[in-house]
Amino acid sequence: MDLIAFANTFPRVWLLALLLLGLIIGSFLNVVIYRLPLMLERSWRQEARFHLGLPAGRPLARYDLCWPPSSCPHCHQRLRMRDNIPLLSWIWLRGRAHCCGGAVSWRYPLIELLSGLSFLLAGLLWQPGLALLGALLCFGIFVALAAIDARTQLLPDVMTLPLLWGGLLFNLADTFVPLEQAVVGAVAGYLSLWLIYWAFRLLSGREALGHGDFKLLAALGAWLGWQALPNLVLIASLTGLTATLLWQRIHRLSMQQPLAFGPWLAVSGAMGLVLNVLGGWSH
């Protein structure tokens, strides 16, 4: 029995498997969201010392996505396996660390839940195959990029560029849109925000967008084609503006405070994938 036949014969089992996979991936995404910016900062500092001719200093302890093992953010005690079960551990421990009782951020279960639900949604919309695999990759990366940009105002090249190339590779087989539309979409996506960036900078002397935003929209264009770009930007702008105004009103923040645009591009990208399979704007 192949995977498509299994999914059609046992749909509940298949969807449950995707939900559990999404929760597990979400747990890993939490590691990426927290550690990747720190890893990049360490790398940038080392490169800066080298280019400035400064001493290298003491060798840094290994720090990557696999090491050291997950630990309590308060007392730094290594987490037990049963304390690291996606979503369930946080609920069971009522948002507290088992080792010291410190509060554990709601961000961790939220990321796991978003990842799990997005995988479940993908299973409802796509049959097992290349399109489903692409959708799962996109949803996972969108969740990670949105969270990283919201925390650090950074969209790492190590995520946006593989997302861009992945869109072109998947569309070699016209998985989401024809390859010609994907290539034009990648170029147009980058250039559109690049032009807006420079126009605003010349008129106001300030920067309204980051270069990571250019690359993320280029990646969305590579997955969904150039025809989707106006709607992607419109959705990202409207949702971002609405959420920003509400957030600033609630927390009484200054309108001059810079805010991330990447999370809203990620939201629009996820909506674009869904509308694409439902016969939306890309056709």
UniProtKB/Swiss-Prot annotation:
Transmembrane segments: 13-33, 106-126, 128-148, 153-173, 176-196, 216-236, 259-279
Taxonomic classification: Bacteria, Pseudomonadati, Pseudomonadota, Gammaproteobacteria, Enterobacterales
InterPro entries, A to Z: Peptidase_A24A_bac, Prepilin_IV_endopep_pep, Prepilin_pept_A24_N, Prepilin_peptidase/N-MTase
Keyword Hydrolase: yes
Name recorded for this polypeptide: Prepilin leader peptidase/N-methyltransferase
Native source organism of the sequence: Dickeya chrysanthemi (Pectobacterium chrysanthemi)
EC number in record: 3.4.23.43, 2.1.1.-
Chemical reaction(s) catalysed: Typically cleaves a -Gly-|-Phe- bond to release an N-terminal, basic peptide of 5-8 residues from type IV prepilin, and then N-methylates the new N-terminal amino group, the methyl donor being S-adenosyl-L-methionine
MF terms in GO: aspartic-type endopeptidase activity; methyltransferase activity
Chief subcellular location: membrane
Keywords: Cell inner membrane, Cell membrane, Hydrolase, Membrane, Methyltransferase, Multifunctional enzyme, Protease, S-adenosyl-L-methionine, Transferase, Transmembrane, Transmembrane helix
Record family assignment: Belongs to the peptidase A24 family.
UniProt topology in membrane: Multi-pass membrane protein
Entry's Gene Ontology cellular component terms: plasma membrane
Biological process annotations from GO: methylation; signal peptide processing
A Pfam short name: Peptidase_A24
Gene3D superfamilies reported in the protein's UniProt record: 1.20.120.1220
Entry's localization field: Cell inner membrane
Function: Plays a role in type II pseudopili formation by proteolytically removing the leader sequence from substrate proteins and subsequently monomethylating the alpha-amino group of the newly exposed N-terminal phenylalanine. Substrates include proteins required for biogenesis of the type II general secretory apparatus.
Signal peptide positions (record): none
